[in-house]
Regions:
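Phosphate-end processing signature that detects enzymes handling 5′-triphosphorylated RNA
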Residues: 1-172
Length: 172
């Protein structure tokens, strides 16, 4: 589940504060979990959206981003039979309190399957890559592919709560 609120100090319009509660369900049947989620009173009236996701995560050979608790990814997203969109996302180190994770996230549309340095402008990237050497060293380190079932709930205060079930795989 993800809760997104406008980020009070965001330098870029695509920045948001993200609070996540992630649950791992090892051994659970995804179909059964999906059916049970659909019966929850909060979700019963919300139409599910199916998406196909492919994520490519990048880092330097020395794993500099991982050491800074940051992540840079490219995501291809296809909803239904629609066109595939590519998004580049930078996530920064966050905090965890009572099982909830909160971290900064900056997302921008990019050309198919290619990192775009321009999309990192207005993000904390210059703070992470202070000497400007990491960008040239970035390479894919792992990929995920999944089918996402998403239900979006908007609270009275404007917060968006995404309730998501991802079923997929990770490849290194």
């Amino acid at each position: 589940m993800t809760i997104q609120r406008p980020h009070p100090t965001a330098a870029a319009p695509a920045a948001s504060a993200e609070i996540e509660l992630k649950l791992a369900l090892p051994g659970a049947d995804p179909r059964t979990v999906g059916e049970q989620m659909a019966q929850l009173p909060l979700l019963a009236d919300l139409a599910p959206v199916q998406q196909k996701l492919r994520n490519i995560y990048f880092d330097t050979p020395a794993q500099d981003l991982r050491q800074q608790r940051a992540a840079l990814r490219l995501r291809s997203l296809r909803q239904g039979s629609g066109k595939t969109r590519w998004l580049q996302t930078l996530k920064t180190a966050g905090t965890a309190t009572a099982g909830l994770s909160q971290r900064g996230e900056w997302e921008a549309a990019v050309h198919e399957g290619q990192l775009d340095p321009v999309a990192l402008q207005g993000t904390p990237w210059p703070t992470l890559d202070q000497d400007g050497q990491w960008l040239a060293q970035l390479a894919p380190c792992f990929e995920t592919e999944s089918t996402r079932t998403l239900r979006l709930f908007t609270a009275d205060d404007g917060s968006r709560i995404e309730v998501v079930l991802d079923v997929g795989s990770v490849r290194a």
